[in-house]
Amino acid sequence: MVSAPSASATADTTPTPGDRSALTALLAVCGVPMMVSALVHRYTRMPEGDEPHYLVINEALKRYGSIHVRQVYDSWAFTAFHPGPLSPHVAAPPHETLPWHGIGGPLLWHVPYLLGGRTGVLLFMVAVSLLTVANVFWLVRGLGLDRRHALLTGVGIGLGSTVLTYTAKAFVEPLAALVVVYGFRVLTKARLRTRDLLLVSAALGALPWVHSRFLPLEFPLVLLLAWRIHRESGLRDRRRWLAFLGPLGVLTVALVTYLRTVWQSFNPSVNQAGDKELLFGANPVKSLVGVLLDQEHGVLFSYPIFLFVLPGVILAVAGGHRTLHLQLLAVVGPYCAILLTSPGWWGGWAPPARLWAAVLPVFAFSIGYALQRARNGLVTAWAAACVLVTMGLDTLCRFSPSNGFSADYGYLVPLRVLEGLTHRSFTGYLPAWHTRAEAPWPFLWWGLAVIAFGLVVLLSARPAARPGPVGGAPSSRTRVAA
């Protein structure tokens, strides 16, 4: 007998005409700033950080039909997108002609690159960001948020998070964010459709091609989805199992074959074998403080919309949605734990929260749940202000010499631009990991401020209409709060 999925862990995502109209409006609201950001970035800035090195892989594929990138660096064949000198990012010997970076991202956007060069890649990234926003909307709508708060949450993620920052850049973290959000959405659906299983299988199979760092995101989603299929139909439904395991298996076998043939190894991280700071070299508690409160690379000063995550989690768990959050913890927990033990948790030369951009959007339900339970004009206004802060910081980055990129500066780059415009000090009042890590007081005071904000949201929350299930029967929606 086929058992139904647990209601507290599944979602009803039956679309309605009103939902489709709301989604269209959401994509328009988010798409215009994203497109403007991408085009401004394209025509006013060279690619920074790892961006040009991903594009070098595309150029090697285009010119030579191979991924031996050394010849692109040696011949300066990258000048179409990076007119200045470019230090090679190549693997350690004996593979010094091969790329340091994963080839999955360049393979995914190679057709846009062939059609439009760097412009095509940035437009591809805008499409990825909009798909992430759309999946966030369907995720939180299916989990019971009303249409208004699902729309607000979508705007918060689309314009108030790392989604906006990285939409105009050729980094691979947005690809992982889309896969994680979509995978979690499929996991929480009331009904697993064959096409969803095919798509999520292909997406999860592509993750380690994009970067081996994303393997800790792939494994939990694969196991949780497999467990759900087994719980609902055992081993009898061969069509479901084939849909789920087929693309995943093909891409996994292809990856193993690629590693063995090209790299003479079965290690998915062989291209970064020279990296000595991957794991277990940092205190995770201290790293967590930096991730949250460091003004330069942390999350909360650049993306204050995530202040709503903790009160949202508390309210949702208290409202009976424990299974959902246990699943969320299982999906993102291993990845976060690994990053917190790495001295490189801050992500190197990049905009803020680069490595965390892969998982931040999946916390959308907690944000939306907090807003819906609060139903307070001031709380909603604060959420809108958080989005405007992120958009303002993103705009100020365009006026900085580094375009918002930093590494060990000890200050938030766009705020330094604002200081120059207003002749006022802002960065001196904020905690800075790389220059003032030994001075704990700024971290303490701002940490207390974060807790106080969470308490305000919790105290403003109205009682849930009925605690318990997030989703309902496939034919109706269950609202999570009055």
Stretch-by-stretch model annotation:
Residues 168-175, 298, 352-353:
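Short acidic/glycine- and proline-prone juxtamembrane loop motifs at membrane-interface regions
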Residues 1-41, 46, 141, 239-247, ...:
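Start-transfer (signal-anchor) and selected internal transmembrane alpha helices
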Residues 15, 144, 173, 183-197, ...:
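Membrane-interface transmembrane helices that cradle and orient dolichyl/undecaprenyl
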Residues 55, 63-115, 272-279, 343:
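Interfacial juxtamembrane loops and adjacent helix segments
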Residues 185-189, 216-249, 308-321, 365:
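Perimembrane helix-loop-helix junctions
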Residues 208, 227, 240-312, 328-341, ...:
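Membrane-lumen/periplasm interface segments of specific transmembrane helices
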Residues 120-145, 178, 182:
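Transmembrane-helix motifs of polytopic, lipid-linked glycan transferases
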Residues 58, 153-158, 186, 196-211, ...:
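Membrane-interface alpha helices of multi-pass inner-membrane proteins
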